[in-house]
Amino acid sequence: MAFKTLDDLSVAGKTVLVRGDLNVPVQDGRVSDTTRLDRLAPTLKELAGKGAKVVVLSHFGRPKGGPDAKNSLRQVVPALEAALGLPVAFAEDCVGESARAAIAAIEPGQVVLLENTRFHAGEEKNDPELARQMAALGDIYVNDAFSAAHRAHASTEGIAHLLPSAAGRLMQAELEALGKALARPERPVMAVVGGAKISTKLDLLLNMVTKVDMLVLGGGMANTFLFAQGRPVGKSLAEKDMADQARAIMEKAAASGCEILLPQDGAMAKEFKAGAPHRVVPVEQIADDEMMLDVGPATVEFVGLKLQGAKTVVWNGPMGAFEIRPFDSGTNAVAGLVAALTGDGRVLSVAGGGDTVAALEQAGVAGRFSYVSTAGGAFLEWLEGKELPGVKALGA
């Protein structure tokens, strides 16, 4: 879809409202992971550099529709200043007199952060009056929070209809990367989908089999597909009540010309813990008292051969219990293969989802993928083929 970017805006002397995602982890009053701030910084610095008054809006945590110190964005100010290399003023509210006064007090080229949008119950209800009050604070609206774009809230959707609107640099990068990966991909496309349950990724799987040429399944959800094929799964995590849905996905894949790749071998252990004694055997040889905690080397080799023919890879979810060693080796190995092919310019690789980012960072390859999305829910809904309200509202 067509959308405006910062290139289409004239911002000098204007007040620009930027919806960012500053919902970052805080421990002992300090931001423990600044990734989202670092990714938002280029948009804020560009606007400030062009002489705009930059006004940042964001949610933080899950307050109950009223102010509370634990969920105040004030604690994010030092980390945001460090990410920007600029001082950041703070307003005690995101609408009303305190917000107006804080914006009036800054000069063009300066930045002010407004208090948590979710301190107003109307934010999550997409209350038109709250959106109107926010819009009254500025001249232009820029959405740079793809990670919140799946929510139709006052600061992500409502406000975009009330002001000239554009995508920030992070939103632009996300939309362009995702467009290349699924909307207009170079084929063949391989999707790697892992994680514990198919029940949480049913819509995603049903959509993906119609869009991709190969679907690699890993993690606990692969066991559900193996079970649906009548193969033994021991005491592995498997949603046996989802066998019919798994068969329906396989039938839809066959009708769509999508090849499903399931584990051929695995690391079988009797208990779920780091360093648990295990053996690597073909999936058919799992014992009744064993669980498959990772894919084995034969599976990695098989996926690697298939990867040689791919031009685009979309990754969501680990291949095994990556959080406990040595059951991260399957995820690490496949991720390493994708990273190497990306580095050689042979594939475009896009990954996203919370566990996925953590797994790729643990494997040391996150920086070697073409694009790693910081969006969790929004990335998943996009993979499900759903329209994202925050993106749709930017439509040019």
From Swiss-Prot:
Cell compartments where the protein resides: Cytoplasm
Positions that bind substrate: D21, L22, N23, R36, H59, F60, G61, R62, R118, R151
Recorded GO MF terms: ADP binding; ATP binding; phosphoglycerate kinase activity
A matching Pfam family: PGK
PROSITE patterns: PGLYCERATE_KINASE
Enzyme class, spelled out: transferase
Keyword tags: ATP-binding, Cytoplasm, Glycolysis, Kinase, Nucleotide-binding, Transferase
EC assignment: 2.7.2.3
Cellular component annotations (GO), alphabetically ordered: cytosol
Catalytic activity: (2R)-3-phosphoglycerate + ATP = (2R)-3-phospho-glyceroyl phosphate + ADP
GO annotation (BP), single: gluconeogenesis
Pathway: Carbohydrate degradation; glycolysis; pyruvate from D-glyceraldehyde 3-phosphate: step 2/5
Residues binding ATP: K201, E323, G353, G354, D355, T356
Subunit structure: Monomer.
Family the UniProt entry places it in: Belongs to the phosphoglycerate kinase family.
Descriptive protein name: Phosphoglycerate kinase
Source organism of the structure: Rhodospirillum centenum (strain ATCC 51521 / SW)
